[in-house]
Amino acid sequence: MQKANKRIDKEYKELTENPPEGFIIKAENIFDTWDVYMKGPEETPYVGGTFLIKMKFPDNYPFKPPKATFSTKMYHPSIKKDSGEICKDIYEEGWVPTKTIKGVLEILKSMLVAPNTDTPLETEIANEYLKEKSKFDATVKEYVTKYAQ
C-alpha cells in the first residue's frame, strides 16, 4: 500500500469508528471520494439540516489537500451557490501534510457557525450577512428546508 493510501486508510478508520460530533463518513472507494454528511450546527440557521460534502483525494495526498465541495445546495458567503465550491482560503491555503481530514471537517463546521466575509465567493450573500442578518438567516432556513432534509 502506498504511503498516501496508508494515510487515507488510517484517517478513514479513525473517522468512521469515532467521527467528530455531527458527522457521518461513508465511501465506496476510500482512496478516491468520501461522502461526508454534516449536521447543521446548533444555534445557527443551518440547524436541522444534513449537508452532503464530497471529499475527493488527490494522488499526492497528504502533500496536497483533498477537494471538498458541498453537494447540498447552500446559501453561504464562502460556498458557490451553483457548484458547491468552497473558498480556497477556508482550508486549502497554507495546507501542510500534517493537517488531517478531521481538522478540515472541523473547519467546515466552524465556517457555518461564523462565516468569513473577508474573501467571499458570493459577494451579495456576504453583504446580506453583514447588513441584513435576519434576511440572511431566513434564506438559509429556506435552503435547509428545501435542500437539506
Where in the sequence are the language-model features?
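UBC/E2-like fold recognition across ubiquitin and ubiquitin-like conjugation systems
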Residues: 1-149
